[in-house]
Each structure stands twice: as structure tokens, then as C-alpha cells.
Design a protein with these regions (language model features):
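Conserved AMP-binding/adenylate-forming core of the ANL superfamily
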Residues: 88-99
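Generic structural signal for well-ordered alpha-helices
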Residues: 101-105
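Oxyanion-binding/catalytic loops of NTP- or PPi-dependent enzymes
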Residues: 1-75, 82, 87-90, 109-566
Length: 566
């Protein structure tokens, strides 16, 4: 039996990544080679060009080889280049993300014996267009033929609400990851979940707390004890030392979530090659002092997101926690005292996004072009149905095509629930192969229906696919536009075309007059105007292919549009 929906979801995180699969109405995290649910988003390349991904790569950060990197997600879609010293190779951020995605894909093949052809990949809600494009390219380079993107807060809400019996509720998704922060108000109502509003910061996360521990606590103590000239984080001379300090800070931060005190230790060489060994005791109170400004900053973003939609904290049922830092009790206490809303961490904050991505993947039909070739003599079916919805008697349809059949008069098709043995009864195909049927679905499980096709003589024929699935569950109504988009006019006014927060796709049509003179029959010249998206401006160039003039207005009849962001 081949898959008819994508089913696999990936959380491509700044510090850690994970992959999950939808099985029925439940999700399963696919463990990696180390038998862990999450894989560190770290990549190393040695002098022979061998690539390592995950914990082994992360361990090499401390080796001072210049051959391992982490947190490259923050630079997705930029021109930044990571240089691997031993091999001399240069890699872009999306190329390193490709290696992480390849590793997750290989984990599925090892654990399930299945080659994943398509997968939903999550992105922060605050990711811009160029960052999303870079993520798509990384997925394609990793071997995924289809990779729909899903915003991380939407994924988290789906993981919580897929099988929930919710009439109407507002949830606040609080996603404090390793390197990015997202806050989103979600509305769950009668089987649909959609984003009401969102905000975020692509440079706010657990890594910032780690670096603050390093710079506010560890560095001052080391400078008070040792003679370390120009001992700053930005000094390439001390790159190795600061990598060790950060790793120690991260470990100590995690330890302090369970105990009152922790010891931060490690060793590195000074400017003269002498080994320096540090042993620093850190109390939970000191950690809270360092971490609190970041938690307060994230809470202020949440409050702004609520106020923009005139929602009070009392209107929100719960805060859904996402991200490793939210596992710490002190973190939760500070957050709840700042927001005044109950917290929900019933689904593991480390894997909730991957699980939600898998749920969404179950709503995405697998593109037939990505499926295995149809065997000789078989019939193909282009299914047209929603794999997930709240209707217990959904409609399903499709079109049958065959190796040589053009007229399907006399053909019949029947759908059979493989578990309950419910049957649709034989449905006559139209002459062009089109059919429509009503299904009967059971709650609490993925309903699989065998497709039985019969020719005019009553002989059963093989089909691809040979099943379709339907699950009664919550669906994402629509994903929102991240930032408003509009055109800057010659009089310095701004004409908004598409509204932030509204569902996609959005379309808008405006008639504008150009201040640039255009002659009838003119071609080859360029019209330039400014497209604004949120706080980002872009230059748009329209290359004129053919123009015509009518009275006082100038019209561009045919144009080629290209966008270049500054």
C-alpha cells in the first residue's frame, strides 16, 4: 500500500531538529542513531570532506578545528558563508540545513525501512520570504520532492488540538526555541484552527541566555583570575575558548532546572599555549537574574500580540509551551507570573512542533508525480478529497485513467473501509472516468478505504493508489501573511495591498499612473517602483514588453516582474 498523504513532519530547529510520522490519529517521533528523539542542528566536515551531523558534530565545536558549526538557521537566506578549515570547503546556511534534513531522512529509512519522498518542514512565523525560500531549497537538496512549509506555532497548536473536542477557544502558542521566538494567538473552533495574530523575534532564544551567562558571569570571573588579553567573544583568537564557555553555560543552565547549584567547568589554552582550567559555581538565583530580561522581553511580545487584536489575558484559555528552555520550572514560573495565563506543557515542548508538522502532513495529499511509476495494465486514480475534516460523512471523488481506456462507460468503483467493512456500494463512472462518493468515517482513528475498480465485465482491476484515507480531526483553516505588503507612491504615501495576519493566498488589484513617460509600442525599458513589506523595502523592476496608451492613462499590457530585496 502506498501513501496517499505526506504523513512526515520535520521541526528544523536552530539548536535541535526532529522528525515525526502520523500513524492513525497519533504521532510517533523517529529516533536517530543515538536512540534520541532530537538531533542537534550541528554539522562538521573533516579534512577528507566527511560530513557529520548531530551530537558528534556538536562535540567537535570544542575542538578548535574550525570544522563544525551550529545555529546556522539564524542566517538562512543570507550571503553568509561558513568556512571549514581542514577541508577548505565553504557552505551556505541552507547547505548546512540540507545536511541536517538528510540525516533525519536517513533516520526514517533506518527505523522504518521507508524512503521519504515528501515532508512538511516548519519555519518560524517571523521568517521572511527569502528565509522560507532558503528552507525550501534545503529540503529539495536533501531529496524531498515536495516540502510544504508550516509555521511553527500552527504546528504546535495542531499537536494539541488535532483530536480535541473544542467548541471555541483562544490559545497562545509560546515558542521559545534555541535561537528564535514566536508568539501566536490561535483560535480553535468547531474543528478548525487558525492564526489570529502573531509576532516574534528571529534573534531571541535559549542561546542568548547561554551567551549572557558567558559574558556576564564566566568572563568577569576568568578575567579576575587569569591574564587574558583581548578576551572577547568577537576575537577570533579566542573562538575555541568561547565555544567551550558556551557549552559549559548551556550544560549548567540545564542542570539548574533540577538543582539549586551547578558547576560550570572546562579547559582551554591561553595566548601562550598554557592550559587554563576553570571551575565556576553558579546558583539558580544568578541564572534567573541573567535569564529574566529575555523572558520578560518574550512576554512583552505576547502582550503586544494580544493587544493588537484587543484580547485580554482572560480571553486566552492556555499558553502552549514550545522549546527546550520552557522545560525549566524557574522559566515557567517567571513566564506565568508575567502573563497571568495557565501554561500547558502536556505535549513535550521539545517535540511538539515535529508532531504537529506530522499532523498537518496527514492533511496534505501526496503528489502523484512523486509516487512510484504505474505498472503496465494498471489504472491510475487522481483523488480529489480532503484527507482530514470534521465531517463524519465526507465526500470523496476522483478521476480514473487507464492504459488504453478512453471511455469508462460501464466501469464501476466501490470504496470499502478496511476495518469496519463498510461499503459505499458500486458507483458508476462517468464516461470520462470521474466519480463522486460519500464515505462513512469513524472517530478516533484514521479510516482507510480500499479502492475496488471493476471493468464492464465485472473483472476487478488494479489501481494506483489502491486506498484513500480520511480522519475526523481539526484542520488548519489557513496560514497568515507574515507582514503587510504594499506599494510606495510618488507622493510618499503608502498603499497597502495585502494585510498582515490575513489568510493566504491573498490577491489585490490596483490601477496606478506612472510618472515615467511611456510611448506606444515602446519596449525594453524598465519601470521601477518600491514594494514595502512590513519594515522591509524592496525594489521592483518591470521590464516593458509591450505597451499601449489611452487618453491620460498609461497601461502596461504585458510585463515581466522580478523582485530584489535590499
Amino acid at each position: 500500500m502506498s501513501r496517499t498523504t505526506i504523513d512526515f513532519g520535520i521541526d528544523l530547529g536552530t539548536t535541535n531538529s526532529a522528525i515525526a510520522v502520523l500513524k492513525g490519529v497519533f504521532t510517533e517521533i523517529i529516533k536517530n542513531n543515538a536512540d534520541a528523539d532530537i538531533t542537534p542542528s550541528a554539522v562538521s566536515i573533516d579534512k577528507k570532506g566527511a560530513v557529520l551531523v548531530g551530537q558528534r558534530a556538536k562535540n567537535k565545536i570544542e575542538g578548535d578545528s574550525g570544522d563544525a558549526y551550529i545555529e546556522f538557521k539564524r542566517r538562512m537566506g543570507t550571503d553568509h558563508v561558513y568556512h571549514f578549515k581542514s577541508s577548505g570547503q565553504n557552505r551556505k546556511p541552507e547547505e548546512l540545513s540540507t545536511e541536517v534534513l538528510k540525516s533525519l531522512r536517513a533516520d526514517v529509512q533506518q527505523r522504518l525501512g521507508e524512503i521519504v519522498e515528501a515532508c512538511v518542514v516548519t519555519v518560524p512565523a517571523a521568517f521572511e520570504l527569502h528565509q522560507c525560500d532558503a528552507t525550501r531549497k534545503a529540503a529539495q537538496a536533501a531529496g524531498f520532492k515536495d516540502s510544504p512549509l508550516l509555521q511553527e506555532p500552527v504546528a504546535a497548536a495542531l499537536a494539541h488540538g488535532f483530536q480535541a473536542d473544542q467548541e471555541k477557544a483562544y490559545w497562545l502558542v509560546y515558542d521559545f526555541g534555541g535561537g528564535t521566538f514566536d508568539a501566536a494567538i490561535m483560535k480553535a473552533e468547531e474543528g478548525t484552527i487558525h492564526v489570529v495574530n502573531h509576532g516574534g523575534d528571529n534573534f531571541l532564544g535559549g542561546s542568548d541566555i547561554d551567551w549572557s551567562i558567558v559574558e556576564q558571569i564566566l568572563v568577569p570571573r576568568l578575567l579576575g583570575e587569569f591574564d587574558l588579553k583581548d578576551f572577547t567573544r568577537g576575537n577570533a583568537k579566542w573562538r575555541h575558548a568561547f565555544a567551550i564557555l558556551k557549552r559549559s553555560a548551556e550544560t549548567g543552565k540545564i542542570d539548574l532546572s533540577r538543582s539549586e547549584r551547578a558547576t560550570l567547568e572546562g579547559k582551554f589554552k591561553d595566548g601562550n599555549g598554557e592550559e587554563i582550567e576553570f571551575d565556576c559555581e553558579l546558583g539558580r538565583g544568578e541564572l534567573i537574574r541573567v535569564a529574566e530580561p529575555f523572558i520578560v522581553r518574550s512576554a512583552e511580545i505576547c502582550k503586544r500580540v494580544l493587544s493588537e487584536k484587543n484580547l485580554s489575558k482572560d480571553a486566552v484559555e492556555k499558553v502552549i509551551l514550545v522549546g527546550g528552555p520552557t522545560l525549566a520550572p524557574y522559566f515557567r514560573e517567571l513566564l506565568e507570573s508575567n502573563l497571568g495565563i495557565p501554561l500547558d506543557h502536556s505535549v513535550d515542548p521539545l517535540t511538539v512542533v515535529a508532531r504537529g508538522a506530522a499532523v498537518f502532513a496527514g492533511t496534505q495529499r501526496f503528489n502523484a508525480r512523486n509516487a512510484a511509476p504505474i505498472a503496465a495494465g494498471e489504472y491510475s486514480i487522481d483523488l480529489r478529497h480532503k484527507p482530514v475534516g470534521m465531517d463524519s460523512a465526507p465526500m470523496a471523488g476522483g478521476k480514473v485513467s487507464g492504459p488504453s481506456t478512453e471511455d469508462f462507460t460501464g466501469f464501476t468503483l466501490e470504496l470499502v473501509n478496511t476495518k469496519t467493512q463498510w461499503r459505499s456500494g458500486k458507483i458508476s463512472l462517468r464516461s470520462d472516468g470521474v466519480f463522486i462518493a460519500n464515505l462513512h468515517a469513524e472517530r478516533g482513528e484514521r479510516n482507510t478505504f480500499a479502492i475496488e475498480l471493476f471493468d464492464p465485465s465485472g473483472a476487478k482491476q488494479k489501481t494506483t493508489p489502491d486506498t484513500l484515507t480520511y480522519t475526523i480531526g481539526a484542520v488548519v483553516e489557513e496560514q497568515p501573511l507574515i507582514n503587510s505588503m504594499g506599494v510606495a507612491l510618488a507622493n510618499n504615501e503608502y498603499d497597502k495591498l495585502c494585510e498582515k495576519g490575513r489568510g493566504l493566498p491573498q490577491k489585490a488589484t490596483r490601477d496606478y499612473r506612472t510618472t515615467h513617460a511611456i510611448r506606444q509600442g515602446q519596449s525594453g525599458e524598465t519601470l521601477k517602483f518600491q514594494l514595502s513589506r512590513g519594515n522591509t523595502n524592496g525594489r521592483i523592476e518591470i521590464v516593458l514588453l509591450e505597451c499601449w496608451k489611452s487618453r491620460a492613462n498609461t497601461f502596461v499590457e504585458i510585463c515581466q516582474l522580478t523582485a530584489k530585496w535590499r
